[in-house]
Every structure is written in C-alpha cells, then in structure tokens.
Amino acid sequence: MGNLATNSRAFFVTGTDTEVGKTFFSVGFLRALNAKDLTTVAYKPVAAGCSQTSKGWQNDDALALQQACSINLAYDEINPIALAEPIAPHIAAKRATEAGLTIDMSIQRIEQGFSQLLQKQADVLVVEGAGGWRLPLGLDADGQQGFLSDFVANQNLAVILVVGMRLGCLNHAMLTADSIRQHGLKLAGWVANTLDPAMPCLHENIESLQGLLNAPLLGVLPQLASPNEVQDYIDLASLGL
C-alpha cells in the first residue's frame, strides 16, 4: 500500500459532498476497529471552521477523531492545518495569509504529518478528508494547483466513500468513484448514509448504487444518535479487517 509501514493499513474517508457524514462515519469506524482490539490513529490534515482555544485553533470534527483513537495523539498530530473560517480551505488559507498569518497547506506538509503518524505503528490509520474528493489546496510554489486527492494518490491509500443519500447522490457518487479510479486508486467500499429518511425511493437509489459503483457496500446507516452505533451497521470483513 504505497509508503505505508508494513504493519499498518490506512484508509482515506471521502464524501460525495460536504456535510454528508464523513466524521460521523469515521468516528464510528475507529470505534468499531477498537472493539476488534485493533490499534488506531486518525488524521484530518485540513479542517476549516475552527475555534480559538487555550491550545490554539481547534476543530470539533478533529477533536472527535482524537477522542476515538486508541493511541493518544496531540491535537496538532491529527489536524496540522486548522483554519478559522468555515469556508473552502484554500480560500480560508488565502484570507488568513493576507491577514498576516503563515499557512502551509502544501501536499508536502500534509505528507509530513502523515509520515509522523505512520511512526505510531498503529494497526489502522484513518484519514478523513475535507469537503468532497477534489478539494483544492491552492497554488504551490511553482504556481500549480494542488488537491487533497493528490496526497491520497501519492500515498496510494484505499478510499472509502460516504454517500449522503439525497436527491442527486447518484451522479455525485458516480463522478467521485470515477475520479478516484482515474487517480489509480482502489475504491475499497462505500457507505450509504441516510440524511433524509423520507427521501423518495431511498432503497431503490441504494440498490442502483450497488450496481453502479462496482465496490462493496460496507453498510447502510440510518439516522443514528451516536457514532458508537455505526459498528452495528457496517461490515469490516469487506475491508479485510
């Protein structure tokens, strides 16, 4: 699996859009792994929408991941790039830079943090993206546009796609799956996350995606009260875990 330590497995969790349940699934996924006595660490390299704390800028999603890991990690290890404004990260970084802050949102910085987590020698490393699959990181030193998906491709990570079940999700899911494969990556599985139980033809849409995505359906998540319940609805065996 690319540059991974020999005793580690890493998965990149992406979504068909923002606010489709990536963090909810990722936290539940970590806790399901912990329940199987697997050691876990998590990485959310980029987070926008952070609050100022006594320990610096912190993001609620990254904090939830930190609490779900079986190995204790400092906040900065999980989320090295914490941006204040809840907007597209590359725009938030540009605005922060214009305000006099130093923001390094390069692929190299993201890969550095990833390498440090590999040194923890966890059984499984869960990386959660921000927004959707093709998240812009802004221009690099050579004026080239970088994307978070470039980091995933560089590390050859297996991808888990969280599909937010709502009108339009078929197109979003298929476009995302196509792009993942165009990067030469494996779509290890996908999760149907029920955003609206009253969605017309919910089950028919899930059945359609099963035929269209050509990847294992890891589980169908109803609306749940807690990520602790996720493990009751997902099949880890499909991931070889």
Question: Which stretches of residues belong to each language-model region?
Answer:
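C-terminal lobe/tail of nucleotide-utilizing enzymes
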Residues: 2-5, 177-241
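N-terminal phosphate/diphosphate-binding loop that engages ATP/GTP or pyrophosphate donors
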Residues: 4-8, 24-104, 108, 113-117
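Glycine-rich phosphate-binding P-loop
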Residues: 12-26
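Short internal beta-strands
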Residues: 44, 160-163, 188-194
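Switch II (G3) loop of P-loop NTPases
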Residues: 103-106, 110-144
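Conserved Switch II/interswitch segment of TRAFAC-class P-loop GTPases
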Residues: 132-134, 156-173
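Inter-motif core of Ras-like GTPase G domains
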Residues: 140-165
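Charged helix-capping and loop-helix junction motifs
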Residues: 140-149, 174-177, 202-207
